[in-house]
């Protein structure tokens, strides 16, 4: 086994021969040996890896090669701008290729306590240029791969500032964020200026840290200057969806506010009127439909009945009975509808009046033939008077109508109209007198009633209330003073407000002060004396002694009274025995 001097050279051999016992020299030689072993191991590893990779490339066909562009599958060249990371000394295992001597012993350090690796030692991927230079053209079918190869060639011929790894990390960002390889070069050229407006599946996936990492040299490409291009696009746009802001706040004057309010009130009033008119029209239509349906029903029924009875001998009698029943039916249905719709307007009343005049004419014509003209005139006057009565007395309409109909059933047409006119006139006179009486009494009661709370004239026990009694717990002179305030019509001051006049107190209350006051000044004096009173120990003992003496005195009096009672009862009891 050769010595250290033989391995390091002749100079080291002379030095070691002259001074072999020096410990410092031994350490220096060991460090030199370790450095030489490290460099030889690195070169051996690189040679072995390159030879293995070349042999694999020769054995495997070109179509089965991995297409990944990751740095793990790319060959390592000596022209890389970043060197390969050298592992620390504690991770190195003794190599049998170039090391014949074990490394110097080192103390064991737990993995948790080992110092962290420096940032510069981290693995950095090599640039794309090395990958493109060593990669041979592929021989598998040229479908999309031909287009991809052309895109790669075009990308390789671009500016070196975008491709160099050291200038900017964003230049090689397509290694991780590349989804544009499958696109047609014509499509790429056409869609390049409008890259932001492209569809979501055609957009490039941008690096979120591109704007922070790139300083400004890569603003020209589509990936790095996204925010700046968006800002330029926003500045160039002339269309705005937001309304322009007013230059200054508009202050409405009082006149404009009043005009606006008046306009709102008038429009709401017009709307209410239109609604009322529509409602009245609907009611009128409903009433007309009901009456027409009743007429149609009764006429059809009478027609059927008349046609069936005309074949028999009693046709005239059946037709008369049917007419009477029909009139009764229409009267009952009409009175029912009138009771339901008591709140109709004057329009509906006129329509009902017209219908009623027609019905009265038909009744008179169906009745006796002798007094036809007189009954028609009477029925017209009756319809006019009933219309006037319905207009002014809607509440009594149904009752008078029923009474009139019952009279019509039993009397002739002429007598019926005369009695109705007399009844209507009497009823109108009664109603007018009653309304006059009610209005007079209401006006008198309005003038007599006092608004607000009143004092009770009778107490709870039934005795009349004395207006001069202002309470039970009053000091002498307070009642008369309160009576004088009441006679003058002034406010009675509360207790504790003696220093102020009633006008001053009222002014304070109007200003917002609560002038309730405290109790009487005597009570205040007693309260202050009791608060400031301090009882000493001697005073307490004297008070207890006085209380004990009073108690003993009371007990002696009770015992003496009991003895006297016993002495008076004993002689009587002995004499009785």
Curated annotation (Swiss-Prot):
Keywords: Coiled coil. Residues 36-49 have a biased composition (Polar residues). The keyword Lipid metabolism does not apply. Residues 529-570 form a coiled coil. Residues 70-89 have a biased composition (Low complexity). The keyword Coiled coil applies. GO terms for cellular component: nucleus. Residues 298-316, 325-336, 386-395 have a biased composition (Basic residues). Residues 340-350 have a biased composition (Acidic residues). Residues 1-479 are annotated as: Disordered. InterPro entries: NKAP (IPR040466), NKAP_C (IPR009269). GO terms for molecular function: chromatin binding. It holds the Pfam family Nkap_C. Residues 20-31, 50-60, 127-163, 170-193, 265-297, 363-385, 396-408, 417-439 have a biased composition (Basic and acidic residues). One of its GO terms (biological process) is regulation of gene expression. Belongs to the NKAP family. PANTHER family: NF-KAPPA B ACTIVATING PROTEIN, NFKB ACTIVATING PROTEIN LIKE. This is NKAP family protein UM04995. It comes from Mycosarcoma maydis (Corn smut fungus). The lineage of its organism: Eukaryota, Fungi, Dikarya, Basidiomycota, Ustilaginomycotina.
